């Protein structure tokens, strides 16, 4: 086997050692070492041929397939734009980095004439590696039109057109055979970008993974996602296996923090640099906007008989901000806006955590803003690190500046935040804090686990028992399940007796359906949910104030994932009303149009977080049986231009009742 499978972070991305060459003519640039050869089309602004050990990784060009990696966006007034489509100007740069390693880079410059938006895309190949270091830049300088629009999507794509690739993977749980050409030809569209494959029941994807295929099935949180890509098992390449991967070796120029989730791979390998698929905020493109994103690394490996897991592990071994940091410093002179090591510091901290805090994480984002809203400051950077059992964490290579520290953990309501964390270049900032969990008295009950996810409830993270790869149920497609069969009488949950995994749904619909198997939408049993609980005289004795906390892992108002207010929609801002016993006036949470997310309909159980706490008189409660009724608008729907469910909905993270 030509490749080792256990690589240290200091290891190169392959064992290639021959000198790198770069040749240019009027129409193309070719970058090549002894294993990897790439041809760049100067007129198109994209790589059009890519070979590893003589194996074609892209296949023939056909429209927008058989090319990549390349850059496009949804960011012009008319929508989509592919960098290089107007007047591509390319530059070839070459040099030797601080380690004595040769490199060559292609820089694409393109200006979208109607607005003056400037695009730059960078591809760098180092000698001894079989992949491309990628940076992307968007700039907008226009005093006449100081506000253009939001940067709704910015992404790079590796888009093959070949039967070489047999599997796609974004995690151990999200690994599957690619649907066959026959399955794709015979598929039935059931939702935007979602197919039913029951016309080809012998297809490997159908047999092993799911009856439904959607690009959203392979989306992931950025906290959990380091590498994703395609695998060739050798069945179409004479027994030789290959991999193509997007390695997220840095994440500091994305937005949304560790809870940002996005598409990864669906036959195309994406690097979704900016998007709002699951409701995350996106930056506005205003006069002076100038942002360089990256680096990330597209790795191409294989050439022997390595398994998918082995090739993926090789890619994952490179997913560290320290990998190739010296190289990035060497090429900073070529990359406008890249922040070199000389302008970065580090943070080390100790947090005394609440009892029973699980999977704690420390997050650094822009000062003064909720961490999921850091796109409000487009120039901001973001970092995070797991906190160990002793409460310690460390984060290196932090761009100098002022940050907010956020700490959260599974099992704990609320977050710890501290503004004003100053990071200085080439200095280490120390933090020592105590996180005192929020409390409004004695906890009477909680429903769900506060972990910023609705996955613990029915059809959430539970594994699908009907397919041998057993994907989590929420990843498959919401319409694969039937509300009327699961909850014929609606939700009637008894604290202390009911099981959250079966008796509480992962999503609270105002209206459920229609689905592929049931053309009738259900609203009578969906919009009102009942939670019953008993209280004793002892629990109520001398209590004056009760506090109800509701944390949502996601919610969809009429704005969906767009953050656009539409006055014609009655649920542009969505009310969730909580009624206590016989009280006629509810405790009302209003989910704003800019807090809405397309969560479960895009196969997610953790999106933009929304929470509310209410104090109310303890006299509203009584000894014996009590009722909390959670109510969404009856028949609450909105207009959808795409093939998506029209219902508004919420997804509960956790609820809690306290008394004092």
Swiss-Prot record:
Glycans are attached at residues 25, 109, 142, 284, 524, 566, 635. Residues 453-466 have a biased composition (Basic and acidic residues). Disulfide bonds: none annotated. It catalyses: Endotype eliminative cleavage of L-alpha-rhamnopyranosyl-(1->4)-alpha-D-galactopyranosyluronic acid bonds of rhamnogalacturonan I domains in ramified hairy regions of pectin leaving L-rhamnopyranose at the reducing end and 4-deoxy-4,5-unsaturated D-galactopyranosyluronic acid at the non-reducing end. This is Rhamnogalacturonate lyase B. CDD domains: RGL4_C, RGL4_M, RGL4_N. GO terms for cellular component: extracellular region. The keyword DNA repair does not apply. Belongs to the polysaccharide lyase 4 family. It is found in: Secreted. Residues 446-466 are annotated as: Disordered. Pfam families: CBM-like, fn3_3. GO terms for molecular function: carbohydrate binding; carbon-oxygen lyase activity, acting on polysaccharides; rhamnogalacturonan endolyase activity. Its EC number is 4.2.2.23. It comes from the Eukaryota. GO terms for biological process: cell wall organization; pectin catabolic process.
